[in-house]
Amino acid sequence: MTNAEIISSGNACLGIEFGSTRIKAVLINDKFEPIANGSFTWENSLIDGIWTYNIEEIHKGLQTCYADLKKDVKEKYNVTLTSFKCAGISAMMHGYLAFDKDDNLLVPFRTWRNTITGAASELLSTLFNFPVPERWSVSHFYQAILNNEEHVSKIANVYTLAAYIHYKLTGEKVIGVGDASGMFPVEFSADKKSCDYKKDFVSKFEALESVKKFGFKIKEVFPKVLMAGENAGKLTEDGAKFLDPEGDLKAGILMCPPEGDAGTGMVATNSVEAQTGNISAGTSVFSMVVLEKDLKKAYPGIIDIVTTPDGYPVAMVHCNNCTGEHNYWMNFFKEIVDTMCGSENSPKIGEFYDKLIMKSLEADEDCGNLLAYNYLSGETITGFNSGRPLFVRGENAQFNIANFMRVQMFSSLGALRVGMDILYDDEKVPVKSMTGAGGYFKTEAGLKYMACAMKTPVSAMETAGEGGPWGMAILAAYATDAQKKSLSDYLNQNVFAECKKETSQPDEKISKSFEVFYERYKKGLAVEKAAVESL
């Protein structure tokens, strides 16, 4: 069938993802190729000290994004969008959307970005002996209880953004396990065919005196946990009108479990199998490694535990700083060239990046005895609440552009490696391959450096730019899979079997160079500390 026939017959699959700056919709065909898309640009607001998105804008954004998708389909294929084989909603994880029994929002949406739940996070992490970050839904929920907030007594349901939108469309109070793992810790059933909130943690939470007085039960307040591929309900008449106010969309469409952006990222990079992982490296950087078993201990503030969309534990290392500092240096150098040659005669910024970063491959093994810290903000992993970008050199340093650029590229990975060393050295976690996405990987050098820093092969896929909404559309397609393969088999055999990718193995010379830098980086943290205290 042609794409037009696939769409008109209702056999395309839809993924919609609420990102922090854009809501995006992607329609895919039976070959998992994106064939139409829509988007809506938005920004969070800081209101009364709370990072939030207005509930009306959430609704408007969804409808505008869908209308943009309809328009794209009409323009490309001259088809009016009326149905899908399956659809799914994903969104930024965590946060707090609290409703009463009549579905009235009790307080403005508190997003993952808020750092207002420190007391709850610390108390729960200690209670569970399990990392419960400030951004998790249960941290927000418990903090509201600790604060004696007026709305708490009226709470009937707490959702993530994806679970809330799914409820609006289907009337089903359910959530995909990956998204659920950012609300409250989860666990497999004995047969590994289902997942739920960890029973012993639920009991401990509900036994807290401050929780008991309200009679809250986690499994009543939080959505029911579903695995990837499960039936998560169907689009209702009201849901269809809500998504498409023009009235063309039909009710009865199958919906898959709503997921979080971490889970859709894993799917989009084919990183759901044990011993695999993915790295997103841009302004900030995080790695996610699928575990074969639970970690031996908790590492609050350093390693978070979430799950794949089919319930396997994932260790997440998140760092606030990656390419931001070397972007400033690039712009600084570009300004020098523009001043000397005139902006009309100087290279465009993309070419400028490529040439300078590739020049770093000519650097000395010890990076010329240079050192840099890219701490535009604090870095929890290395113990900094705030940061100061630094460039330091010894008196006998070989200060040239190749060494300078390499140390900037290595600095982007220093804190990430500190977190990964816990997995490698303390927990003995095996990692056979990782897949990268983001600006750090735009050059061959970036891919090489990441492989050496992570001590494992790292690949960049040609599909990496498709991102979360494409991953959500794949999860929607997976929910219709008649063969009921495992998610990893489905991705390997159906989606990525012929996917082109560029893989970099750890290079012996560059690996030695990184290790020399890394030892200097750890020793030099005292310099960074002095800068924070003095400047």
Where does each model-flagged region fall?
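Gly/Ser/Thr-rich active-site cleft segment
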Residues: 18-20, 128-259, 373-374, 405, ...
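A polyampholytic, Gly/Pro-enriched intrinsically disordered region
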Residues: 126-139, 276-278, 478-493
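Acidic, glycine-rich loop-and-beta core segments that form the ion-binding/anion-interacting portion
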Residues: 258-298, 303-306
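N-terminal phosphate-binding loop and adjacent alpha-helix
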Residues: 38-79, 129
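Glycine/Thr-rich phosphate-binding loops that ligate phosphate moieties of nucleotide
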Residues: 1-40, 44-46, 56, 64, ...
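Phosphate/pyrophosphate-binding loops at sites that engage ATP/ADP/AMP, CoA/4′-phosphopantetheine
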Residues: 64-84, 148-152, 201, 205-218, ...
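Alpha-helical scaffold segments in soluble metabolic enzymes
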Residues: 123, 140-147, 164, 168, ...
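Conserved phosphate-binding catalytic cores of ATP/NTP-utilizing and phosphoryl-transfer enzymes
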Residues: 1-9, 75-78, 143-147, 237-248, ...
